[in-house]
């Protein structure tokens, strides 16, 4: 189940006081339906994926409202993960270690996962500064020519979203509807709702839908593990390299992740 009031999390409240309010981030009913939509899409059961995604977006405004630009770009506690839109998330108290171990500008270029400016130019284009995700998550730091990835940086605040890791986003449901909708009007309406809440120019033609969906997955899910599986589902033979620049040629072997050693040691 999910609370009736929506995502009302009180900053500074004790864990007990906030316990029920955090249910919008747990694997609640709508998170299960969202996961169902994702799996149906992967299985190419498009009508079932569409129905499940529509059930989730039907409560978007009530339970998972769009994060505003002022919240995303707040100077003290920027909500870089668009937390109010998360259908399912995990709490990770050491989340900032992702940033300090791999992305902090305190590291030297050869010690960090540094994304070439050419990669960002390809996915964000000439209107990058209008995109809230670019403005909040990609920043030039002293000592580096390329932008550093700030999505998981330490907020130094008690904001409830400071330790959240996104698992399922409401935006993914709108992307699924855009991909599986029965007519172009519904498809454009669905993806444009996300674009409008990211500061991105709206689509006017369905001819751009496929390329825009690819572009949105690249921008929306960076650092969250979803992009790889989008590439795999679409069986893309070539993908952009986020670290080396240029493209990476893909095949069936590269799309199969190796099993962890802990799972193979005793087989």
Residue ranges of predicted features:
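Structured, solvent-exposed acidic/aromatic patches
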Residues: 1-170, 184, 267
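Extracytoplasmic/secreted envelope proteins and their assembly/folding machinery
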Residues: 29, 50-53, 188-191, 210, ...
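Alpha-helical junction/boundary sensor with strong preference for TPR arrays
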Residues: 59-63, 198-201, 217
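Terminal alpha-helical segments
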Residues: 136, 183-185, 190, 203
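Long, intrinsically disordered, low-complexity segments
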Residues: 164, 206-267
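Active/binding-pocket-proximal capping segment
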Residues: 174, 186-198
């Amino acid at each position: 189940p999910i609370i009736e009031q929506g995502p009302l999390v009180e900053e500074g409240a004790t864990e007990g006081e906030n316990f029920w309010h955090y249910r919008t981030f747990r694997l609640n009913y709508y998170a299960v339906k969202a996961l169902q939509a994702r799996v149906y899409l992967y299985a190419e059961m498009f009508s079932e994926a569409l129905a499940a995604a529509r059930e989730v977006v039907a409560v978007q405004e009530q339970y998972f409202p769009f994060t505003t630009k002022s919240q995303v770009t707040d100077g003290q506690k920027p909500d870089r993960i668009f937390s109010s839109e998360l259908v399912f998330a995990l709490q990770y108290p050491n989340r900032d270690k992702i940033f300090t171990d791999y992305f902090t500008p305190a590291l030297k270029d050869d010690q960090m996962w540094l994304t070439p400016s050419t990669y960002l130019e390809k996915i964000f284009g000439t209107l990058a500064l209008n995109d809230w995700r670019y403005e909040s998550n990609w920043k030039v730091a002293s000592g580096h020519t390329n932008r550093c990835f700030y999505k998981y940086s330490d907020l130094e605040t008690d904001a409830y979203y400071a330790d959240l890791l996104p698992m399922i986003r409401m935006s993914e449901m709108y992307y699924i509807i855009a991909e599986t909708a029965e007519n172009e009007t519904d498809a454009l309406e669905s993806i444009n709702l996300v674009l409008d809440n990211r500061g991105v120019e709206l689509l006017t033609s369905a001819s751009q839908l496929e390329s825009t969906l690819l572009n949105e997955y690249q921008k929306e899910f960076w650092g969250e593990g979803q992009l790889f599986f989008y590439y795999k589902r679409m069986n893309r033979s070539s993908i952009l390299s986020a670290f080396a620049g240029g493209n990476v040629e893909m095949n069936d072997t590269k799309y199969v992740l190796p099993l962890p050693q802990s799972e193979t040691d005793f087989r």
